[in-house]
UniProtKB/Swiss-Prot annotation:
It comes from Botryotinia fuckeliana (strain B05.10). Pathway: Amino-acid biosynthesis; L-methionine biosynthesis via salvage pathway; L-methionine from S-methyl-5-thio-alpha-D-ribose 1-phosphate: step 1/6. This is Methylthioribose-1-phosphate isomerase. HAMAP family: Salvage_MtnA. The gene is mri1. One of its GO terms (cellular component) is cytoplasm. It catalyses: 5-(methylsulfanyl)-alpha-D-ribose 1-phosphate = 5-(methylsulfanyl)-D-ribulose 1-phosphate. It is an enzyme of class 5 (isomerase). GO terms for molecular function: S-methyl-5-thioribose-1-phosphate isomerase activity.
């Protein structure tokens, strides 16, 4: 493989990596309809807030490329687009990237219909389809640029938190890095300990168009020679950490160790000083206006543990994951998933000799099938436990008053969605159709 790709796209064709088969099988599913995209998202064959939005947007682009709408007028094309997007929204209601992308694509499609300069119905329909397709492809293109920026900002933020070593140290030089303070030409180099981090769930190339958000920061730390070690949780019950993040870390040859979700406290207590564990870095399915963050179940527990051990807790998310229309985490809808995700598990068969047969899989029960199960897919971490939100526009750090101010990095969206103003200063009268992605 030249590189890990969750999504392969060429105009008119979309393939999505079936992540339920990882790490033992590498299989791409052809996605040619919105129904197939819905099923891929709902079944978690594709997951990660950015990837979900991209797959949904591109699946409809594929339909439109092949003219499956069968529209006779431009307004029929817009109606078809809106209906299909509303359907796709139901595949993952917690992920704000999906709802934001849908708002954008509806707006783009309507604008294309209003500005088409032809009286030919066939040409007008084609213009609306093309406007949608170009906008959907732009979401894919901009996601990678966004992730690279998040990685860079996050790595530099964590580097700035490190204290220089005052005296000469003769320990293993591979555990240290040397750098001059930024913007200080000619200043003396200072030596710092490399840092270690813990991450949860999967937020890398498999959850995005490439590089990743939280895992993207880890990639950037490693590339910049700031990273000592990366720890990842298995992330029960779907094991995205053990199946996917561990797979990516090994593939990238990043020094790493897998732990169970319940080992994090012990890891911090025993290894914080030894390994210079400086941060827990997680992604986000939705960040509310006050900084409360919905993410994979188990994130909240890690935030509480990080605070108890004086370890930075960092959320890595594109600005499209920040929901300014949701005041706090209390307003975030959390979906429940099937009980069998806790009581059963699938994997490659291990023979008596210890050999893993990747061509043979089995599903086994690991709990009494009669037990009641509570299986929320996400939890909400209160903003008081979050030190910084890293975006493609830089970091937003929790203030001394315990608040997050996203206005500085998203002034236009803030004016529209919080203050109720249109770009020209007029009051906004609808419920969000003016939403626009920062990178489109």
């Amino acid at each position: 493989m030249a590189g890990l790709e969750a999504i392969k796209y060429g105009r008119g064709r979309l393939e999505v990596l079936d992540q339920l088969r990882l790490p033992h099988e590498f299989v791409y599913d052809n996605v040619s309809t919105c129904e197939e995209a819905f099923d891929s998202i709902k079944s978690m064959r594709v997951r990660g807030a950015p990837a979900i939005a991209i797959v949904a947007a591109l699946a409809l682009a594929v339909e439109l490329h092949h003219k499956k709408d069968d529209s006779k007028t431009k307004q029929e094309t817009v109606q078809y687009i809106n209906k299909r997007l509303d359907y796709l929204l139901g595949s993952r209601p917690t992920a704000v990237d999906l709802s934001n992308a849908i708002k954008l694509l509806k707006r783009v499609s309507q604008a294309a219909a209003e500005t088409t300069g032809t009286n030919d119905d066939n040409a007008a329909c084609a213009n609306v389809r093309n406007g949608y397709i170009v906008a959907a492809e732009k979401i894919l293109e901009d996601d990678l640029t966004t992730n690279l920026a998040i990685g860079r900002y996050g790595a530099e933020y964590l580097r700035r938190q490190q204290m220089p070593i005052g005296e000469e140290n003769n320990d293993d030089p591979s555990k240290f890095f040397t750098t001059s303070p930024p913007c200080t030409q000619g200043a003396m180099d200072k030596t710092y300990r490399k840092l270690s981090v813990l991450t949860h769930c999967n937020t890398g190339s498999l959850a995005t168009s490439g590089h990743g958000t939280a895992l993207g920061i880890i990639r950037s730390l490693h590339k910049m020679n700031y990273l000592d070690h990366a720890y990842c949780t298995e992330t029960r019950p779907y094991n995205q950490g053990s199946r996917l993040t561990a797979f990516e870390l090994v593939y990238e040859k990043i020094p790493s160790t897998l732990i169970t979700d319940s080992m994090a406290g012990a890891l911090f207590a025993r290894m914080k000083d030894i390994k210079n564990i400086s941060a827990v870095i997680v992604g986000a399915d939705r960040v509310a206006r006050n900084g409360d963050t919905a993410n994979k179940i188990g994130t909240y527990s890690l935030a509480v543990l990080a605070k108890a051990h004086n370890i930075k807790f960092i959320v890595a998310a594109p600005t499209t994951s920040i929901d300014l229309e949701t005041a706090s985490g209390e307003d975030i809808k959390i979906e429940d998933r099937a009980p069998t995700e806790l009581t059963q598990i699938s994997g490659a068969v291990v023979g008596k000799d210890g050999h893993v047969d990747v061509n043979s899989t089995a599903r086994v029960a690991i709990a009494h099938q009669g037990i009641n199960v509570w299986n929320p897919s996400f939890d909400v971490t209160p903003s008081m436990y979050i030190d910084a939100v890293i975006t493609e526009k830089g970091e937003v750090v929790r203030s001394s008053q315990g608040t997050f101010d996203f206005k500085a990095i998203m002034p236009e969206r803030w004016a529209q969605q919080v203050e109720g103003k249109e770009p020209n200063g007029k009051a906004q009268v609808d419920d969000g159709t003016l939403f626009q992605m920062e990178n489109i």
